[in-house]
């Protein structure tokens, strides 16, 4: 259920016909249903004016309500969840009503621009001890959204009356934001620095909390190019803001992605690949849910995995959720990002207390053995355990494994603060129960409260890191 507050008188006019709601309730009639969507095509920015709306939206809209007040800046509606334990907001999208409110930093510094990632992109400019994350831009994968990116940056520079001394971009060279950063740096003769995706996540949550001491960071998301060329996403990182040193301490067990991007759209591929990693190549008593729909493709998958044809490895926490959801029969395929993980979160039997094992493997490189979570899920499904119980045991096992890993590194490094970031931290179970479990282990969690934990926070992490970099280079 989504709750929307009217922010213009126009909303009252549009909804005036619903004033009979009380009568409907009294007469036991069906209440009217409203479907809300923003004024844009998928993956494109919101239409800015009447003419643009007519050109871009006439195929999907039957009626246009014009207004004589021009829109100067595109701004989506903000989307939040509420942490039921703490009451704190958990941003999914930070835009209308919250931007351009600044995030206050620990120190004053020079002006830095963080151009953001490719998905859920924002840009951030720093000014003194303040960082200004922009409103939601979207997925920067087409010309229209890239133009909005440039348009918004120009607007922010004019509003704040600043020009960046450093531009920070993602490690991935093919992101349109990375290409734009290099072009902008060349045009303005500004240096461009590179910060890996998941370190940017951790620097974002540290900056938001004005925390400058060393911290252990969990960056849990879907994808990001790692320093070793593989796809990261289930990372335990050491970050030292004082001198900007960092280290990858551990990661989730690798899972192959047969078909690359196709595996993201079809989680059954990830599930079957994960099963093969633990030695399971055929169904047990539990029939794999995807066999009816994808029996032919499933038969070819072992050969693709064996020859590693278009099959990158990932340590992604998001892909782990996808695999488990597919195993549970919740999503063979998806039509929107996070669909499989959302279903897995929602179906949990919250009365269940048993957790699957998720041990830390001490060999180099150190890994959290998330393959054991897959094994636990498979064994329970074979034994006929209901999916809601399986889903809950998976969540509890992951939380237990993360806490054990954090505690182990805390003892080794004498560091007690644990920063939590990444799109998986939008999962309300992890967002509420993981910080509590860390506190019970004697650790101090640092979480997002002012910006989303998803990739929308990347530009903040880039900008805060870049500002510290300039301060170190020019004390």
Feature map (PLM): residue ranges:
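Short glycine-aspartate micro-motif
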Residues: 34, 112-114, 168, 215-219, ...
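Short beta-alpha connecting loops at secondary-structure transitions
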Residues: 247-261, 285-286, 305-309, 443-449
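Glycine-rich phosphate-binding/hydrolytic loop that grips phosphoryl groups
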Residues: 198-220, 224-226, 267-276, 395, ...
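Conserved phosphate/anionic-ligand binding catalytic regions in large, soluble enzymes, centered on
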Residues: 33-45, 172, 221-231, 308-331, ...
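Conserved phosphate-binding/catalytic loops in two-lobed NTP-binding clefts
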Residues: 170, 189-201, 416-421, 428, ...
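Short beta-strand scaffold segments in enzyme catalytic cores
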Residues: 77-81, 121-126, 218, 234-238, ...
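A contiguous, well-structured pocket-lining segment that forms one wall/lid of small-molecule binding clefts
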Residues: 117-147, 151-155, 179, 273-415, ...
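Active-site-adjacent structural elements in enzyme catalytic cores
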Residues: 1-168, 172-187
């Amino acid at each position: 259920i989504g709750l929307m507050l009217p922010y213009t008188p126009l909303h009252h006019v549009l909804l005036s016909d619903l004033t009979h709601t009380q009568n409907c309730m009294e007469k036991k009639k069906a209440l009217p249903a409203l479907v809300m969507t923003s004024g844009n095509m998928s993956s494109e920015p919101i239409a800015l004016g009447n003419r643009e709306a007519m050109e871009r939206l006439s195929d999907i809209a039957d009626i246009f309500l014009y207004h004589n007040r021009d829109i100067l800046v595109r701004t989506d509606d903000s989307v939040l969840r509420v942490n039921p334990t703490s009451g704190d907001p958990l941003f999914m999208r930070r835009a209308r009503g919250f931007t351009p409110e600044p995030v206050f930093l620990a120190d004053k510094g020079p002006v830095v621009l963080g151009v953001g990632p490719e998905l859920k992109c924002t840009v951030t400019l720093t000014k003194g001890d303040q960082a200004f994350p922009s409103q939601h831009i979207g997925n920067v994968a087409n010309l229209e959204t890239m133009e909005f990116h440039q348009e918004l940056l120009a607007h922010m520079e004019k509003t704040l009356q600043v020009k960046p001394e450093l531009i920070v971009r993602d490690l991935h060279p093919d992101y349109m934001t990375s290409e734009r950063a290099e072009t902008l740096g060349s045009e303005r003769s500004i240096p461009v620095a590179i910060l890996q995706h998941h370190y940017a996540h951790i620097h974002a949550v540290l900056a938001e909390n004005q925390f400058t001491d060393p911290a252990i960071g969990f960056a849990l998301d879907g994808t990001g190019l790692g320093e070793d060329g593989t796809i990261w996403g289930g990372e335990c990182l050491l970050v030292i803001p004082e001198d900007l040193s960092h280290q990858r301490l551990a990661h989730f067990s690798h899972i192959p992605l047969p078909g690359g991007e196709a595996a993201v759209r079809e989680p059954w591929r990830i599930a079957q690949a994960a099963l093969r990693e633990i030695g399971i190549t055929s169904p047990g008593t539990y029939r794999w849910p995807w066999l009816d729909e994808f029996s032919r493709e499933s038969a070819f998958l072992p050969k693709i995995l064996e020859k590693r044809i278009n099959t990158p490895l990932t340590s992604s926490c998001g892909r782990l959720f996808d695999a488990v959801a597919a195993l549970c029969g919740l999503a063979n395929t998806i039509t929107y990002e996070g669909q499989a993980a959302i279903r897995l979160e929602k179906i949990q039997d919250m009365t269940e207390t048993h957790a699957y094992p998720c041990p830390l493997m001490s060999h180099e490189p150190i890994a959290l053995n998330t393959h054991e979570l897959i094994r636990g899920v498979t064994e329970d499904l074979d034994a006929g355990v209901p999916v809601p119980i399986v889903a809950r045991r998976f969540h509890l096992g992951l939380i237990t494994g993360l806490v054990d890993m954090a505690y182990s590194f805390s003892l080794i490094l004498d560091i007690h603060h644990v920063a939590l970031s990444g799109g998986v931290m939008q999962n309300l179970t992890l967002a509420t129960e993981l910080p509590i479990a860390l506190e019970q282990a004697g650790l101090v969690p640092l979480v997002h409260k002012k910006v989303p934990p998803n990739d929308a926070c990347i530009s903040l992490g880039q900008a805060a890191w870049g500002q510290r970099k300039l301060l170190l280079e020019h004390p």
